[in-house]
């Protein structure tokens, strides 16, 4: 069995897919450069921070899938 510390492959794919979207949204109409936004998004995702767009979306999809079971 896998430790709860590690996410599933599907969850990791979802988080990776949403990381650039979250970085783009945080950089849009702000003084932050896109590279800074992407770096902060990746750091937040590695820390599993709930404020991170990609982690938030992944957790939301997992919550909906669990409720549908």
From Swiss-Prot:
Keywords: Ribonucleoprotein, Ribosomal protein, RNA-binding, rRNA-binding
Gene3D superfamilies: Ribosomal protein S7 domain
Gene Ontology MF term list: rRNA binding
GO cellular component, one term: ribonucleoprotein complex
Family matches, as InterPro entries: Ribosomal_uS7_dom, Ribosomal_uS7_dom_sf
Family affiliation: Belongs to the universal ribosomal protein uS7 family.
Record note on quaternary structure: Part of the 30S ribosomal subunit.
Function: One of the primary rRNA binding proteins, it binds directly to 16S rRNA where it nucleates assembly of the head domain of the 30S subunit. Is located at the subunit interface close to the decoding center.
Name of this chain's protein: Small ribosomal subunit protein uS7
